[in-house]
């Protein structure tokens, strides 16, 4: 069975204008999303808090984007051994009824931690998605992602 590989890096963006200029001048970079609004709500189980462990290695999130909803669980873990690498178990699915998910969370005593709203502009360069995120009440970030590669 083939395994899906996703490589992703995020970092604070100190000069978004410079990055935008380079992407716009590059004929191979195509604008694939502009000023898309994402609303992420993060949750944690009642019996433990995902924020207690630093760096945060586990999270549960719902996302609203263009009247579409999804739910994602991620858990980062370090492999054993001398040359250990980090791996992420990620489970994500689309959701038709976000209010039903919130009600399920309420019944299971899964509590809301924080809501993060951001505006994302994305470019596709070869097999790489380069996104500029403006996070409300924070700052700008760049996300570089290679995904849907199978080995």
Where are these regions (language model features)?
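Short, flexible turn/loop "capping" segments at secondary-structure junctions
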Residues: 1-3, 135-138
């Amino acid at each position: 069975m083939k395994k899906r590989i996703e490589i992703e890096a995020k970092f604070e963006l100190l000069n978004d204008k410079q990055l935008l200029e380079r992407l716009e001048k590059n004929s191979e970079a195509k604008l694939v999303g502009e000023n898309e609004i994402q609303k992420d709500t993060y949750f944690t189980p009642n019996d433990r808090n995902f924020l207690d462990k630093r760096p945060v290695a586990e999270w549960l999130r719902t996302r609203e984007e263009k009247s579409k909803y999804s739910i994602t669980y991620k858990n980062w873990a370090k492999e054993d051994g001398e040359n250990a690498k980090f791996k992420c178990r990620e489970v994500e699915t689309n959701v038709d009824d976000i209010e039903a998910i919130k009600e399920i969370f309420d019944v299971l005593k899964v509590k809301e931690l924080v809501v993060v709203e951001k505006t994302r502009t994305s470019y596709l360069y070869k097999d790489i998605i380069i996104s500029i995120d403006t996070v409300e009440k924070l700052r700008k970030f760049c996300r570089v992602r290679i995904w849907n590669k199978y080995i």
